[in-house]
From Swiss-Prot:
Belongs to the short-chain dehydrogenases/reductases (SDR) family. In the retina detected in the cone and rod photoreceptor outer segments, weak expression in Mueller cells. Keywords: Lipid metabolism, NADP, Oxidoreductase, Phosphoprotein. GO terms for molecular function: 11-cis-retinol dehydrogenase activity; all-trans-retinol dehydrogenase (NADP+) activity. It comes from Bos taurus (Bovine). The gene is RDH14. It catalyses: all-trans-retinol + NADP(+) = all-trans-retinal + NADPH + H(+); 11-cis-retinol + NADP(+) = 11-cis-retinal + NADPH + H(+); 9-cis-retinol + NADP(+) = 9-cis-retinal + NADPH + H(+). This is Retinol dehydrogenase 14. The active site is at residue 217. The lineage of its organism: Eukaryota, Metazoa, Chordata, Craniata, Vertebrata. GO terms for cellular component: cytosol; endoplasmic reticulum; nucleoplasm; photoreceptor outer segment.
C-alpha cells in the first residue's frame, strides 16, 4: 500500500511538473508593448487603487515603463512609499529618481493615501485629486478584499461589498468630471471570473441576514460588472470609456484570509507555482485596456487575456444594473 501511494504521489508530482514545464515554455511573460512603444503613455496620468502589491503593483510597473505618470492610491502610505521606492529602482534607469513625464524614459510615481473602506477617505482623496491634478487619463479600479471574515467598513457596510463595489463607485463618480475634462480617457475595472457564482440580493446587500464569504466576494465582482455596463451607458458620447476585466488566477496576497491546512500547503504552493499566473502576467489585460490603441472608443465590454469575452445573462441585466446604481448612490451619499 505504501509503495502504491508513493508511486501515485510521484506520478502526480511528475504530471504537475510536466504541465508546469509546458506552461512556462509556451507562455513566458509577454509584455504588451516592447521598446518601440515605450513612450506610449508619456504625458498621461493614471490612477491605480491598491497599487502597492500584487496586480496593482505589477500594473503600475508596466505603465511606468510606458512613460505614464502613475498615482498609487493606497490605504497604507508607508507600505506604498516602500513599494514606490522598489518600483523606481526596478524601472527607472540606474536606480535613480523618476525620469519624469517628458524625459523620454520611464514615467513618474506619486503616492496618495486612499482607504476604500472609508467614504470620508474617498472624498478627501478625490478633493485632493481635483485640487492638485490638472488631468486624469486613466482610472484603474484595482484594489479589492477577498473572502474575509465578516466585518464592516467605517460606514457600516459589509467589507467586500463596501470596498470592492461601493468605495470604487463613489471614487469613480467623484472623479468623472476630471476624466471628462481629460477626454479621451479610460476607466478600467478589475473584476473576477468568480462573478458567475454571485447574485445581487437587494433585500440583503449588507449581508445582515447571512454571510458566506465566498458568495459575498462573487457578488461584489458581479456588482463591478453591472456597474461598468451601466456607467458605459451613462458615458455614451463623452469620449470616456469604461471596461471590465478578469485577470485569471494570480499568485498574490489577495487570498490571505483563506486558511490552507499546514499539511496541504506544500502541494498548494506547487500547484499555484505551476498553474497560477504571476502578477506580471495577470496585469497584462489591465495594461492593455489602459493603453492599447486597439480598444480606443471601446466601452462596456468584458475582457480576459486581452480579448473580449462573453458574459452570463445575469451580468447583462440592465434593470438590475440600474437598480444597483440607484441604490449605490443612496448608500454612498451621492443622493439622500
Amino acid at each position: 500500500m505504501a509503495v502504491g501511494t508513493a508511486a501515485a504521489l510521484l506520478a502526480a508530482l511528475g504530471g504537475i511538473l510536466w504541465l508546469a514545464a509546458r506552461r512556462f515554455v509556451g507562455s513566458s511573460v509577454q509584455r504588451l508593448h516592447q521598446g518601440r512603444d515605450s513612450g506610449l503613455m508619456r504625458g498621461k496620468t493614471v490612477l491605480i487603487t491598491g497599487a502597492n502589491s500584487g496586480l496593482g503593483r505589477a500594473t503600475a510597473a508596466e505603465l511606468l515603463r510606458l512613460g505614464a505618470r502613475v498615482i498609487m492610491g493606497c490605504r497604507d502610505r508607508e507600505r506604498a512609499e516602500e513599494a514606490a521606492g522598489q518600483l523606481r529602482r526596478e524601472v527607472c534607469p540606474a536606480g535613480g529618481p523618476d525620469s519624469g513625464p517628458n524625459s523620454g524614459g520611464a514615467g513618474e510615481l506619486v503616492v496618495k493615501e486612499l482607504d476604500l473602506a472609508s467614504l470620508s477617505s474617498v472624498r478627501s482623496f478625490c478633493q485632493e485629486m481635483l485640487q492638485e491634478e490638472p488631468r486624469l487619463d486613466v482610472l484603474i479600479n484595482n484594489a479589492g478584499v477577498f473572502q474575509c471574515p465578516y466585518m464592516k467598513t467605517e460606514d457600516g457596510f459589509e467589507m467586500q461589498f463596501g470596498v470592492n463595489h461601493l468605495g470604487h463607485f463613489l471614487l469613480t463618480n467623484l472623479l468623472l468630471g476630471l476624466l471628462k475634462s481629460s477626454a479621451p480617457s479610460r476607466i478600467v475595472v478589475v473584476s473576477s471570473k468568480l462573478y458567475k457564482y454571485g447574485d445581487i440580493n437587494f433585500e440583503d446587500l449588507n449581508s445582515e441576514q447571512s454571510y458566506n464569504k465566498s458568495f459575498c466576494y462573487s457578488r461584489s465582482k458581479l456588482a463591478n460588472i453591472l456597474f461598468t455596463r451601466e456607467l458605459a451607458r451613462r458615458l455614451e458620447g463623452t469620449s470616456v470609456t469604461v471596461n471590465v476585466l478578469h485577470p485569471g488566477i494570480v499568485r498574490t496576497n489577495l487570498g490571505r484570509h483563506i486558511h490552507i491546512p499546514l499539511l496541504v500547503r506544500p502541494l498548494f504552493n506547487l500547484v499555484s507555482w505551476a498553474f497560477f499566473k504571476t502578477p506580471e502576467e495577470g496585469a497584462q489585460t489591465a495594461v492593455y485596456l489602459a493603453s492599447s490603441p486597439e480598444v480606443e472608443g471601446v466601452s462596456g465590454r468584458y475582457f480576459g487575456d486581452c480579448k473580449e469575452e462573453e458574459l452570463l445573462p445575469k451580468a447583462m441585466d440592465e434593470s438590475v444594473a440600474r437598480k444597483l446604481w440607484d441604490i449605490s448612490e443612496v448608500m454612498v451619499g451621492i443622493l439622500k
